[in-house]
């Protein structure tokens, strides 16, 4: 994965790839905390006498605060930096995961999941911004794919791991194990991560290679925090990215929360068997994420292909493959169902690193966290909607068919947004003093006076 590079005949060390691996491990553990509920759901449903609609609400509990805090988390990240926000976030999500162990009913589990959503809100924006700092543009796709693929790979190893723990020790231990892993990552991040300019283990040769290759400049914008937010919300490019990535998020979170339950209910599998089958689409997604969304993009750009065309081609084609979810509505055979879901998730996973690399590619200086926060806010509103809508549809129809059809329609809207609204993948100019003055004037004239 880490490949040797040279500058003026000098071999460039690979400290940046160690940081990329650290970020990937963080997302992997982060997602263990998310998927453990989907695995433990059958036991918890029985223990607390919960309906499918109740489970849909529990699945969404994480996403309400997680989504609502995305923009504040992005602003906070741009103000205080990757190092501080990353450390506090890692500590708090370990603490929040541990709280779930002691929940005693629907209300306790809902509250614990909501706290986890608060704690993990800065997670992906931190990884996106850190990747922008640490990697030149020509390596950005693979670097982004490392942490994004970790989210998919968590379902390959996390679902079976948590399933074994849940079956043998009960659902509470499923949450306890992920809490311990979260605290271990906090210690690793505390010891290892620094921004490039402050990392004593980063050689001058590699720092020069990173900076001259178009890495995102460290530092803050001259615009105020809220001035940057207001400025970015006027940009069509930001809205195109936001709508498109939200559409991706609906299908992703539907599968993340409901896939094991779909296999248990529709295909009549046990918890352990459903965990094994559910791992297959996520394994496919991990491979396409790294190979297509990561390596292939960097390879084509390095060979001189147009950057916008390459990234957009993978983005849109991946979303089109996501429409294979329609195929799963036409079968009751578990093998064919997994086949269609694997194609859908594989396509979405190939598109995802492009989406996550875009904030560091299009944002003005000091605005990466804010763009990432806006994008991930909409993405995780779908994380709220997908499990709730799916739960109510399944409860009303006793079938997942219409739930999958809804996901396909939303994907089609996202494809249109990426193609026709977002435009070229180019950096948005920094806001000027005139932009700031205009924003303030607009704010004053729109404020009622008495």
Task: Mark where each language-model region is.
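Extracytoplasmic gate region of multi-pass secondary transporters
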Residues: 37-38, 233-291, 352, 356, ...
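Helix-breaking motifs and short loop linkers at transmembrane-helix boundaries and internal kinks
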Residues: 49, 81, 102-108, 119, ...
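Central cavity-lining transmembrane alpha-helices of secondary-active solute carriers
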Residues: 60-75, 279-293
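Conserved MFS/SLC helix-loop-helix module at the cytosolic interface between two early adjacent transmembrane helices
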Residues: 68-107
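Cytoplasmic helix-loop-helix junction between adjacent transmembrane helices
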Residues: 112-153
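Helix-loop-helix hairpin linking two adjacent transmembrane segments in secondary transporters
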Residues: 147-200
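C-terminal transmembrane helical hairpin of 12-TM major facilitator-type secondary transporters
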Residues: 308-355
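A late C-terminal transmembrane helix in Major Facilitator Superfamily
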Residues: 360-397
């Amino acid at each position: 994965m880490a490949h040797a590079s040279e500058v003026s005949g000098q071999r460039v060390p690979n400290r940046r790839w160690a940081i990329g691996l650290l970020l990937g491990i963080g997302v992997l553990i982060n997602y263990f905390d998310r998927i453990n509920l989907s695995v433990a759901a059958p036991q918890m449903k029985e223990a607390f006498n919960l309906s499918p609609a109740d489970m849909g609400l529990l699945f969404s509990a994480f996403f309400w605060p997680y989504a609502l805090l995305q923009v504040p988390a992005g602003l906070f990240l741009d103000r205080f930096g990757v190092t501080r926000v990353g450390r506090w976030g890692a500590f708090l999500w370990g603490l929040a995961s541990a709280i779930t162990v002691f929940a005693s009913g629907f209300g306790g589990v809902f509250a614990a999941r909501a706290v986890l959503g608060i704690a993990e809100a800065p997670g992906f924006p931190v990884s996106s911004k850190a990747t922008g700092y640490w990697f030149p543009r020509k390596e950005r796709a693979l670097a982004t794919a490392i942490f994004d693929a970790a989210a998919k790979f968590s379902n390959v190893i996390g679902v079976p791991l948590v399933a074994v723990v849940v079956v043998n020790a009960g659902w509470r231990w499923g949450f306890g194990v992920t809490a311990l892993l979260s605290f271990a990552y906090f210690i690793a991040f505390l010891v290892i991560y620094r921004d490039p300019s402050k990392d004593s283990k980063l050689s001058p040769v590699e720092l020069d290679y990173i900076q001259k290759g178009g890495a995102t400049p460290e530092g803050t914008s001259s615009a105020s925090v809220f001035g940057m937010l207001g400025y970015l919300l006027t940009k069509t490019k930001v809205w195109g990215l936001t709508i498109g990535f939200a559409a991706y998020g609906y299908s992703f979170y539907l599968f993340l929360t409901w896939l094991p339950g779909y296999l248990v209910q529709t295909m009549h599998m046990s918890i352990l068997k459903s965990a094994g089958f559910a791992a297959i689409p996520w394994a496919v997604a991990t491979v396409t994420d790294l190979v297509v969304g990561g390596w292939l993009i960097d390879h084509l750009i390095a060979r001189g292909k147009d950057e916008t065309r390459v990234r957009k081609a993978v983005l849109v084609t991946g979303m089109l493959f996501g429409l294979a979810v329609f195929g799963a509505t036409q079968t009751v055979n578990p093998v064919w169902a997994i086949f269609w879901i694997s194609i859908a998730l594989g396509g979405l996973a190939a598109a995802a690193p492009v989406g996550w690399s875009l904030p560091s590619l299009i944002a003005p200086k000091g605005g990466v966290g804010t763009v990432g926060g806006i994008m991930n806010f909409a993405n995780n509103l779908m994380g709220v909607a997908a499990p709730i809508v799916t739960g109510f549809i399944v409860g009303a129809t006793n079938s997942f068919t219409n739930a999958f059809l809804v996901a396909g329609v939303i994907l089609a809207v996202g494809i249109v947004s990426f193609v026709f609204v977002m435009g070229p993948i180019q950096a948005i100019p920094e806001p000027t003093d005139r932009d700031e003055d205009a924003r303030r004037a607009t704010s004053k004239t729109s404020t009622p006076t008495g």
